[in-house]
């Protein structure tokens, strides 16, 4: 999953 990348880009 890309939840970490999502949160990182959703900063």
From Swiss-Prot:
Catalyzed reactions: sulfate + ATP + H(+) = adenosine 5'-phosphosulfate + diphosphate
EC code(s) of this entry: 2.7.7.4
Coiled coil: none
Domain of life: Eukaryota
Molecular function via GO: ATP binding; sulfate adenylyltransferase (ATP) activity
Keywords linked to the UniProt accession: ATP-binding, Nucleotide-binding, Nucleotidyltransferase, Transferase
Homology family: Belongs to the sulfate adenylyltransferase family.
Name under which the protein is recorded: Sulfate adenylyltransferase
Lineage: Eukaryota, Viridiplantae, Streptophyta, Embryophyta, Tracheophyta
């Amino acid at each position: 999953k890309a939840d970490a990348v999502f949160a990182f880009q959703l900063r």
